[in-house]
Amino acid sequence: MPKMKTHRGAAKRFKKTGTGKIKRGQSKMRHILTSKETKTKRKLTASAYVSDADHAKVARMIPYA
């Protein structure tokens, strides 16, 4: 069986933690920020975790992370 290839786009967006969870960044922070409240923008800077429903798909994209 050949080696699995890492999805390069996913590798730039996700990181595996020591416990096996997958960290991700929040969306909606690239542009059109003047209409967002400061509190909202501050909350969006924090990282989040990939949901259980998506965990298997993302884990397959980054097999060696």
Curated annotation (Swiss-Prot):
Cross-referenced HAMAP family: Ribosomal_bL35
Family of this protein: Belongs to the bacterial ribosomal protein bL35 family.
Protein name, per record: Large ribosomal subunit protein bL35
Stretches for region Disordered: 1-28
Organism field: Acidobacterium capsulatum (strain ATCC 51196 / DSM 11244 / BCRC 80197 / JCM 7670 / NBRC 15755 / NCIMB 13165 / 161)
This protein's GO CC annotations: cytosolic large ribosomal subunit
Gene Ontology BP annotations: translation
Keyword DNA repair: no
